Amino acid sequence: MTLRLTLRALACASLLGTAVMNAPALAWEPTKPVEIVVPFSAGGASDQMARSIQGIIAKHKLMAQPIIVLNKAGASGAEGLMDTKASRGDAHKLLVTSSALYTVPMISQLPFNWRDLTPVAMVALDEFVLWTNAESPYKTPADFLAEAKKNPGKMKMGGTSSKREDQIITAQVERKAGAKFIYIPYKGGGEAATQLSGKHIDANVNNPSESIGQWRAGEHRALCVFAPARMDYSGKITATQSWGDIPTCKEQGLDVQYQMLRVFMLPGGVTPDQQKYYVELMQKVVATPEWKEYLEKNALKNEFLSGQKLVDFLGADENRHKDIIKEAGFVAAR
């Protein structure tokens, strides 16, 4: 009897072992809080996006672990980029960034390449608007540029950081219009918006989300959007205007176009399962009604890319920026 029971127990153990071996492995998921690194200051568009996604994930319980948003804005975004690069293999850290992913390394000769990281998803394209103070006499880009040409090197254009998207656009405007501005760099679009409200600068080229509060309050005037087409949102933001009511700069005689990606990246050295987890997380985020409301409120273009399509986009956009930066004369001397 004892031998029979022993053999039966061994058979059961063998079957159990086989079942365990054949069972599918549990999918990876975070085991501690996840940091979203924002390489810009609080209040800017990237910061707002990170905190909005943080709220969506918490509301819909899309992840068991909490998300912590950290601003690492030093050196025009280089601090956040290098921090993420140095976190190789850490799947509990995400970087949310913009075209600074390649413009900062190009301009500053930073020892960083976006290929050092692991692409997750591009979740939107962001627009740029030429804003002036609502009490200024400038009703159109032509009015504004005429004054700038009459007073070369005297009118002040504010923007986020030096030699980044805002100053790149400013340089393109100068070249196309034959004007010259004093460019004033700030840590983020929130500060640039505040400075324009206080009339410390004459204009800025903030993203819509960075100036929506001031526009709604009647402090800022939108002259044109640097996009191929008008923004596709018709809900009124001010008493009389929607995002779609803002003409393109090209419509107004200023042929400058610029859109900026909003992308999430993991450090290098993570596993395919870890990358897949965050791709699927972002797919869940962009499917929520709150995300769609966020896109419309901030006039973001709905554009989602992951996998090879994202890698191809990053390579092409990087090459486009090489040409723009070279034309602007922003490449640092080696």
Locations of regions flagged by a protein language model:
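Bacterial N-terminal signal peptides that target proteins for export
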Residues: 1-12
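C-terminal segment of classical bacterial N-terminal signal peptides
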Residues: 15-25
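N-terminal (or domain-start) structured segment
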Residues: 26-116, 154, 178-203, 207, ...
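An extracytoplasmic/periplasmic, membrane-proximal ligand-sensing/linker region
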Residues: 31-33, 175, 216, 272-334
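Ligand-binding pocket segment of bilobal, Venus flytrap-like solute-binding proteins
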Residues: 73, 154, 158-245
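Hinge/capping helix and adjacent helix->loop/strand transition within the periplasmic-binding protein
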Residues: 83-92, 105-191, 249-251, 261-294
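C-terminal lobe and pocket-closing loops
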Residues: 125, 211-287, 316-319
